[in-house]
Amino acid sequence: DALIGFAAYTSALPGSRHNHHWQAGGLFAHSLDVGHKALVASASFNVTHGSHSMDREANTLAWQLVVFLCGLLHDVGKVHSMGRVFARTVVLRDEAGRERHDYRPTQPVVWRPSVCSLHEWVSRFDVDSFAIEFYPPGKHKTQHHALWVDRYFHQLVPQPLRAFIYDSDPQIVRLLDEFMQEPLGAAQSALNKAVKDADAISALESLSPGESPSKVHLSNVAVRRIKEFAEDQLWNFPNSTLIR
């Protein structure tokens, strides 16, 4: 249900105007890719070591769900910040039921993400094709798109899944709450690291089609991670994620 709801909002939208995943459907493709890559990376972080043995399996699943969902939703705010989506043509039907697909509306038919999903908008207004009027790069709306993660997490993730997550280990809940407050921010939590690294690698792969991330790209991630650990006085403790 979370994936279907997410697709209803992002579907044919690009991931950016001129950068990575700029094609139609790029936002959904990039988001799903980041969710998957972050899920794979989550195995390198042991955040359930303090759990009771009977709860560890459930807590591990909760951790995996949190990482995947945060990766999936990390760019969802772009539906608000990317630009103005409007109908270019709509479908009209005559009295005989025949359809005309090239009618240009006389009044603007604009999508409002705060009102309904893109899928609902297309269905409700019989939109045949739409375009995006991108906001200027310096405009404030292009910033802080990550701050929408909290809203869409609670809107798109089914209640049973949210209940399962919030009933899990307090450490997992804390990591999720921190991410909601500042997605992809400066926090050096396991969740932020997993999603940020997945985001960076997915973008690089998009900019180099048909190629795997080069050793240089991956080494940049590794160097950044080592610098982060160098600032942590506990980097060489047995429970450090660098040691694990």
Which ranges hold each PLM region?
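Amphipathic, well-packed alpha-helical segments that form the structural scaffold of globular domains
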Residues: 4, 32-39, 43, 154
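Surface-exposed polar/charged interaction patches
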Residues: 9, 182, 186, 229-232
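Divalent metal-dependent catalytic cores for phosphoryl transfer on phosphate-bearing substrates
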Residues: 15, 44-219
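Phosphate/oxyanion-binding active-site loops and adjacent basic polyanion-contact surfaces
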Residues: 23-38, 141-149
